[in-house]
Amino acid sequence: MNPATLSTQTSQGMAATPNGTGSEEALRQLEAIEPPEDLLDPQMSENALKVLERRYLKKDPETGKVVETPRQLFWRVASNIARPELSYPDGSADRALAVAREFYDLMARRRFMPNSPTLMNAGREMGMLSACFVLPVEDSIEGIFDSIKATALIQKAGGGTGFSFSRLRPQGDIVRSSGGTTEGPLSFIQVFSKATDAIQQGAFRRGANMGILRGDHPDVIQFITFTADLGRLQNYNISVTGTNKFIDELRSEPSKAHTVLNPRTKEWVPLEKRDAEGNATGEHWTVGEVWDLVVQHAWRTGEPGVVFIDRVNERNPIKNVGLIEATNPCGEQPLHPYDSCNLGSVNLGILVKPGPGGEPVFDWDEYKQIIHTTTRFLDNVIEANRYPLPQIDNMSKTTRRIGLGVMGFADALFK
């Protein structure tokens, strides 16, 4: 199934031809800007309306004036995310319309909300609907700047990006092609950061990134302490990987010298301590000292986080696709290189209702139905999406990653 092969052009920019017959009226309603009249108006607070106006509703490109209502926004999203139903084996316009009505109802009644790129871009020219991406960073100038270009395309459309810089050779290592030495991962992280600074995501928000370095990379100490200056990397979360080897040594031999692996030479060596001028002191970092440094800086600045990368790969259900090296900016989605994920959240607070005796009860039956419908919504996003690169299109449709979470947990407990 490939939405690019579908042929009936809609007023909202997505194409589809139903496999089944369906009705012309159902197709007309799917293509309409206004939702069917019998659908309820969105239940929105004053604050929510302000956020919609500021970030999500369509604006006139010349005047900046809002030209879309919340009702039209939710139908734009619902109808476009339902259109992949037309290309399924049992697809028909009537079925797609029924699914679109379900999607609209979930959003209008505040049961569910998809990630920002879906709200911003569904049915619009940009068409990029995913929130999370991971890009590879190869140890070459070409590979590094290919990733920067891909980052620009993703963040322009409202997505966030994660990277592992662990393949880059360490500071001071030789560059055979030029005869010089490299500045190491930290200098290139700053190049990525500057590129992100120059891009305002979808004209709605600044870019977000995750930068990861293996705990056994030779530049790990500089990486851990890099955000001690709070003015650095304002658009980055950073994390070090904690391997099984490191954790085992931390438990059993914390005073053992911490060994690191040069990604170019594949040579393991003890990690030397250096003075303020960068000169070797003749001493080595121990495993316990490296861990203490991580804890100290995480307490002071909130960075770095720790990604247990071996555990991630052990639990990866699609190991045949390859190793996972990085996560999305918030860290909840480990992804393969060129992979993406679209996200959404179920509102738990609104599912607490008065019981038979007036006591608050959680509506588990509605919760189950919402999960079923929203999983379908997120999977449809994979097909409706316009990916910024063919590699991302291929990987995303191979892995079919979705992330369904919850919001309103505190509200549910309060009720």
Regions found by a protein language model. Give the residues of each.
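Extended catalytic cores of very large enzyme megasubunits
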Residues: 1-415
